[in-house]
């Protein structure tokens, strides 16, 4: 069973295309193909819960899970979801990629966005409001592509 599900030998034997294999084994692949086909080449992506930027083929920030994500610091500094969105925009990002499945896995192991102290609940609330302040362009396999509005 492992060989049937994960093996790429079918690609080498030309029984399956590389794209079909990637689509079947990588949850972010179809979102990445959407980005490549629909977003301008100058798009700048902020990846959240996604540490595999290769297929997106756009300038991006995708921190390793064992490093603090810049979004953590920006959230601590923000007074509102609008402040956070404005900061992301000022940093030059045009789009956000959110992989919720991978985010949960990484957060469980690396505690990506664990806020502490008296402001923790407020900071968590600001971060959770972020998706609702952007425009969703694509969603599949729990991977979302958002556009950051020019103004809010």
Short names for language-model regions:
Residues 1-34, 50-53:
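Membrane-proximal, lumen/periplasm-facing interface regions of secretory-pathway glyco-
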Residues 36-41, 46-88, 96, 104-129:
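Extracytoplasmic
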Residues 91:
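Active-site charged/polar residues at nucleotide-handling catalytic sites that mediate phosphoryl
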Residues 128-139:
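Short secondary-structure junctions
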Residues 140-145:
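Short hydrophobic/aromatic beta-strand or adjacent loop that forms the aromatic wall/cage
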Residues 146-152:
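Short beta-strand-to-coil "C-cap" segments at the C-terminal boundary of structured domains/repeats
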């Amino acid at each position: 069973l492992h060989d049937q599900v994960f093996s790429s030998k079918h690609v080498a034997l030309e029984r399956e295309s590389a794209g079909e294999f990637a689509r079947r084994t990588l949850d972010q692949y179809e979102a990445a193909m959407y980005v490549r086909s629909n977003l301008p080449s100058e798009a700048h992506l902020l990846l959240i819960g996604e540490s595999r930027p290769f297929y997106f083929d756009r300038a991006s920030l995708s921190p390793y899970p064992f490093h603090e994500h810049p979004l953590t610091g920006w959230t601590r500094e923000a007074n509102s979801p609008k402040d956070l969105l404005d900061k992301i925009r000022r940093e030059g990002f045009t789009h956000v990629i959110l992989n919720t499945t991978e985010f949960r896995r990484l957060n469980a192991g690396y505690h990506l966005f664990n806020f502490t102290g008296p402001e923790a609940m407020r900071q968590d609330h600001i971060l959770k409001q972020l998706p609702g302040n952007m425009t969703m362009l694509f969603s599949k396999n729990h991977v979302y592509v958002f556009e950051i509005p020019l103004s809010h």
